[in-house]
C-alpha cells in the first residue's frame, strides 16, 4: 500500500493501472492527465468499479458509493486529487 498524501507516484500508478487493466495496453496511457475518461470513452461503468477497487487496495483509502462521481473519477488529475484528499482526511482523523 502506498501513502498517497504527498506521493508523486499517484498519477503514474493510476495511468499504469488504466493502461494495463482497462485499455489492455503495454504502451502506457495515451492521454493527458486532464482528459475526461467518460467523454473520451476510456472507462465504462465496469471500468469505474475496477478503478474504485484499485484505489482502495493500492492507496488504502475507503471510497464510499456516494463518492463515485465524475467529480472524483473522471480523469487522472481528478482521481489523484481525490485520493490525496481522502488520505489526508484519514491521516488527520487517525491523529
Residue ranges and their predicted role:
Residues 67-78:
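AMP-binding/adenylate-forming catalytic domain of the ANL superfamily
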Residues 49:
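Conserved catalytic core of two-component sensor histidine kinases
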Residues 4-8, 42, 70:
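Charge-dense, low-complexity intrinsically disordered segments
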Residues 2-30, 81-95:
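Thiotemplate assembly-line natural product biosynthesis machinery
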Residues 52:
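Short-chain dehydrogenase/reductase
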Residues 22-42, 60-69, 92-95:
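Phosphopantetheine carrier-protein modules
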Residues 45:
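Catalytic nucleophile serine of serine hydrolases
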